[in-house]
UniProtKB/Swiss-Prot annotation:
This is Protein NrdI. It holds the Pfam family Flavodoxin_NdrI. One of its GO terms (biological process) is protein modification process. Belongs to the NrdI family. InterPro entries: Flavoprotein-like_sf, RNR_Ib_NrdI_bac, RNR_NrdI. Probably involved in ribonucleotide reductase function. It comes from Pectobacterium carotovorum subsp. carotovorum (strain PC1).
Amino acid sequence: MNPLVYFSSQSENTHRFISRVGLPALRIPIATEQPALKVDRPYILVVPSYGGGSTKGAVPRQVIIFLNDPHNRAYLRGVIAAGNTNFGAAYCIAGDIIAQKCQVPYLYRFELLGTAEDVANVRKGVTEFWQQQTT
């Protein structure tokens, strides 16, 4: 199965969610001085939303750098976003921004660490998404 590619800050919220999903995953490095992640096959991006309710700064800088690499962007097939409902209309806005700019489907959104239901939905949805891509 093709991987999930994700970014998680030092809070590790997205990392913990990805660990619970249990599917193959690659992590975008936190520190920009670490070696850049280069993908070699289609993937779904899992991204947290930042900015405290504003669209400015909603997409983490590391994700912007990753997607600004045309090689990495070419393999993007969908996006899943994490967020905080306290952000109101900007809840999971990073997913909206990336889906629109990269012209890929926005597959799912979840709050903070996600619930057991979110984990099951993402696991099932990602599996079905890749099966549909190969038929």
